[in-house]
Amino acid sequence: MATNRTFTMIKPDGVQNGHIGGIVNMITEAGFKIVSMKLTQLTVADAQKFYEVHAARPFYGELVAFMSRGPIVAAILEKDNAVEDFRTLIGATNPADAAEGTIRKKYATSIGENAVHGSDSDENAAIEGAFHFAGREQF
């Protein structure tokens, strides 16, 4: 297993519901190193660009509105097998289907408000990390 990076966001519901500390704690306890992190807010245009891969999907407009409604925490994480291990840590998109001990099981309230985003591939992790962090912000 090679050490690599993944990207995550604590979504507006996770921030609004006061779960930043709990989620970050779960991430670090799972062995991830936080190499970049910031509190920010996506504009509608930012959210449209970030999620443009979903533009043709029926939930796109709702997703863009949700992701731009309040602050998020964006982070780049490092660990052996980072993408796969983080996807396991966050759990299924639907918190009702998420395994016990996962972030979404503990902090998500619905499919739409599922607390966190995690990259689905090494390639997307690099793209998503670069979207939120300039090279000088990545350590």
UniProtKB/Swiss-Prot annotation:
Top EC group: transferase
Keywords: ATP-binding, Cytoplasm, Kinase, Magnesium, Metal-binding, Nucleotide metabolism, Nucleotide-binding, Phosphoprotein, Transferase
Binding site for ATP: K11, F59, R87, T93, R104, N114
Domain of life: Bacteria
Positions annotated as active site in the UniProt record: H117
Biological processes per GO annotation: CTP biosynthetic process; GTP biosynthetic process; UTP biosynthetic process
GO molecular function: ATP binding; metal ion binding; nucleoside diphosphate kinase activity
Localization per Swiss-Prot or TrEMBL: Cytoplasm
UniProt xrefs under SUPFAM superfamilies: Nucleoside diphosphate kinase, NDK
Primary location class: cytoplasm
Requisite cofactors: Mg(2+)
UniProt EC number: 2.7.4.6
PROSITE patterns linked to this entry: NDPK_LIKE
Gene3D superfamilies reported in the protein's UniProt record: Nucleoside diphosphate kinase-like domain
Catalyses which reaction(s): a 2'-deoxyribonucleoside 5'-diphosphate + ATP = a 2'-deoxyribonucleoside 5'-triphosphate + ADP; a ribonucleoside 5'-diphosphate + ATP = a ribonucleoside 5'-triphosphate + ADP
Self-association state and partner proteins as the record states: Homotetramer.
Family designation: Belongs to the NDK family.
Protein name per Swiss-Prot or TrEMBL: Nucleoside diphosphate kinase
The species this protein was found in: Flavobacterium psychrophilum (strain ATCC 49511 / DSM 21280 / CIP 103535 / JIP02/86)
Designated gene of the protein: ndk
